[in-house]
Amino acid sequence: MKVTFYEDRNFQGRSYDCMSDCADFSSYMSRCHSCRVHSGCWMMYDQPNYMGNQYFFRRGEYADYMSMFGMSNCIRSCRMIPMHRGSYRMRIYERENFMGQMYEMADDCDSIMDRYRMPHCQSCHVMDGHWLMYEQPHYRGRMWYFRPGEYRSFSNMGGMRFMSMRRIMDSWY
């Protein structure tokens, strides 16, 4: 898996090749305005240490990603998303700490309100696979990356309320 970052738009200026997670680009380049994802899927963050807004990038060229995604800040850190082969399973909960209504999911859901009559979820347990969750129905708005693990509360995620979710499939690589 590899991504090349460029200081300027249209793949100009100094570049940095990245083949694993990078918590802070500042030691390699002062800014980043374009990138080429040669292989793999990546989460990009507009703050160091995998903080701030998250953006999903898959194989392709992003000559001016800030305009493309409506970003106000440059990418400052990135995380490689490992390829997952196998089943996908996640439990979503109506309230924090795995309380309230619970639903188990194994496929994409473009609206938890339409499917489960649940306005949003506030905690989840990802058992299998890697997922993207979105603050609005139909995979819109800000997103957050979830890998296997327990997420007891979304309150530390900038007050995000998730209303749709999709699997990161191996066909995206």
From Swiss-Prot:
It holds the Pfam family Crystall. InterPro entries: Beta/Gamma-Crystallin, Beta/gamma_crystallin, G_crystallin-like. Gene3D superfamilies: Crystallins. Keywords: Eye lens protein, Repeat. Residues 83-87 are annotated as: Connecting peptide. One of its GO terms (molecular function) is structural constituent of eye lens. Residues 1-39, 40-82, 88-128, 129-169 form the Beta/gamma crystallin 'Greek key' domain. One of its GO terms (biological process) is visual perception. Has a two-domain beta-structure, folded into four very similar Greek key motifs. Crystallins are the dominant structural components of the vertebrate eye lens. Belongs to the beta/gamma-crystallin family. Monomer. PANTHER family: BETA/GAMMA CRYSTALLIN, CRYGM2B PROTEIN-RELATED. This is Gamma-crystallin M2. It comes from Cyprinus carpio (Common carp).
